[in-house]
Amino acid sequence: MVVRATEIEGLMVIRMRQVEDERGTVREFYRESSWLSAGLPSLGPWLQVNLTETRRGAVRGLHAESMHKLVAIASGQAFGAYLDLRAGSPTRGNVEQLRLAPGTQVLVPQGVANGFQSLSAGGSQYLYCFDHEWVAGMAGVAISPLTAGIQWPLAIDADDRSQVSAKDQAAPPLTELPPN
């Protein structure tokens, strides 16, 4: 397991331990003792785990839930975007952009907006775990090609519901969020 810090405080990119043989690959998604040895926070117990299937070009997010989130691509390729929205954070306003593939996880701290765009022709499967149960009304930021300078790799039509959900598009734009 390899852990890399980012330009956003607490946002970590983790390369999972993998074992490959003739049958395929096993990826160790979470082992508490390995996480603690790597200096990562204890995250259990997970109270909700979701797996989404997302078509090529579609975007999910930007969501800024009030919980920690561990995300990974189970299949396909995706682009991940992260924006620190936390009041008082020394990295507030910082953006991290990553290519995501199986074997890579991202630990998203509470209050950091996160979103992803599927890049694979056959779509992407995105696994995410929460340390709290999701409830309606959690914070987010509207997707636009100009949101915080995020460079989405595929063109986005925010009015196309096959690309951006009505809920995600109804989130406030970044310019309407309260200042620090």
Regions from the PLM with identified roles:
Residues 99-121:
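Conserved metal-binding segment of the jelly-roll/cupin
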